[in-house]
Amino acid sequence: MAENGTNCDQRRGAMSKEQHNGSFTDPSSVNEKKRRDREERQNIVLWRQPLITLQYFSLETLVVLKEWTSKLWHRQSMVVSFFLLLAALVATYYVEGAHQQYVQRIEKQFLLYAYWIGLGILSSVGLGTGLHTFLLYLGPHIASVTLAAYECNSVNFPEPPYPDQIICPDEEGTEGAISLWSIISKVRIEACMWGIGTAIGELPPYFMARAARLSGAEPDDEEYQEFEEMLEHAETAQDFASRAKLAVQKLVQKVGFFGILACASIPNPLFDLAGITCGHFLVPFWTFFGATLIGKAIIKMHIQKIFVIVTFSKHIVEQMVAFIGAVPGIGPSLQKPFQEYLEAQRQKLHHRSEAGTAQGENWLSWTFEKLVVAMVCYFILSIINSMAQSYAKRIQQRLNSEEKTK
């Protein structure tokens, strides 16, 4: 696969120079200008330039809406087909009949799948922020199921309210009936859907790099530009980060499917580079996406599930609480809120009638709730900053084009 598109390598290197009035600009000055432009864009954030950031965000939103409107206008047949299908689904949903029991069941499953796939996409794409939805949503969900399973001696939680709320079933389970596999099976759907979402979120770097390689155009994406610079200076790379990126690139390029599978299965921050590498070397789509899907939705998710389940198993949690209490001086005061939190969770699991009543709030749960709110707020702010910087990049590209034509 490394041979695909190799005739374009020298042409790609030649495109790093700009021709102006019959002469070529020094590549070092071009790189310096790109660096200054990048630093200028990075300063466009809400806490430094709030008015400009909000203005650019609004303008970028209008530009994106205009682009999507234009794309949809040129695909009128697809839009009409979509609305006809939507109208048929709405009619099926609201018309009374014997089919409603199946509609409700499909709706429940669809919303469950869409929720976790959406969180997986957000975790993978992140829009420049890396919103770690595993730490905020899936991890706590697996931990809650694990704690409840050991407390109830069962994973047959009543539905509803599960998965929105976990309470013990009326029939008591036998002591020691819970196994690692039973908890893994209970959270398999949520975890696999989340993993599928993360695999889908890895597609944009692949498509961007593939389109840039096939078209031969100068790419706008900074990560792709850094990737090309890394290939040009591969022999002189000295720092650890560059060597790690080169190792990932060589693994994917030479091993192919199993190299991509290895990168997707092992938690690492460099998988975006694998997507760019596969797109750049024109790896077939199903080779890339198939390996990514298997690695992220099956292998990696089982590794993460087992880690969370083992960490929050009953005896491990009890040992951690006891260890906290053994800290000299401050141990008992630190141990108390953890004990209160665990006791409150047990009460919620065993008292069905009190599940909806207000209970005293523990500072641990209060802290976690505020952490989630802060992460979501930061994610929203980062979207605003990212879109504002995208509009600033449009302005810089327009100015650079005008300079070249003078």
UniProtKB/Swiss-Prot annotation:
Residue segments, region Required for interaction with BECN1: 378-406
VTT domain: annotated span: 173-316
In-chain residues carrying the UniProt-annotated modification N-acetylalanine: A2
Induction remark: Overexpressed only in pancreas during acute pancreatitis. Up-regulated by starvation. Up-regulated following MTOR-inhibition by rapamycin.
Membrane topology type: Multi-pass membrane protein
Biased composition, class Polar residues, residue ranges: 21-30
Subcellular location: Endoplasmic reticulum-Golgi intermediate compartment membrane; Cell membrane; Vacuole membrane; Endoplasmic reticulum membrane
Key word Acetylation present: yes
Origin: domain of life: Eukaryota
Any single Gene Ontology cellular-component annotation: autophagosome membrane
Location of the region described as Disordered in the Swiss-Prot/TrEMBL record: 1-37
UniProt tissue specificity: Highly expressed in intestine, kidney, ovary and placenta, moderately expressed in liver, lung, stomach, thymus, brain, and testis and slightly expressed in control thyroid and retina. Strongly expressed in pancreas (acinar cells) during acute pancreatitis.
Basic and acidic residues biased stretches: 9-20
UniProt keywords, alphabetically: Acetylation, Autophagy, Cell adhesion, Cell membrane, Endoplasmic reticulum, Lipid transport, Membrane, Transmembrane, Transmembrane helix, Transport, Vacuole
Transmembrane segments: 78-98, 110-130, 251-271, 274-294, 306-326, 364-384
Molecular function, one GO term: phospholipid scramblase activity
GO biological processes: autophagosome assembly; autophagosome membrane docking; autophagy; cell junction assembly; cell-cell adhesion; embryo implantation; Golgi organization; lipoprotein transport
Subunit details: Interacts with BECN1. Interacts with TJP1. Interacts with TP53INP2. Interacts with TMEM41B. Interacts with ATP2A2, PLN and SLN; competes with PLN and SLN to prevent them from forming an inhibitory complex with ATP2A2. Interacts with ATG2A.
Similarity remark: Belongs to the VMP1 family.
Function field: Phospholipid scramblase involved in lipid homeostasis and membrane dynamics processes. Has phospholipid scramblase activity toward cholesterol and phosphatidylserine, as well as phosphatidylethanolamine and phosphatidylcholine. Required for autophagosome formation: participates in early stages of autophagosome biogenesis at the endoplasmic reticulum (ER) membrane by reequilibrating the leaflets of the ER as lipids are extracted by ATG2 (ATG2A or ATG2B) to mediate autophagosome assembly. Regulates ATP2A2 activity to control ER-isolation membrane contacts for autophagosome formation.
Protein name per Swiss-Prot or TrEMBL: Vacuole membrane protein 1
Organism for this UniProt entry: Rattus norvegicus
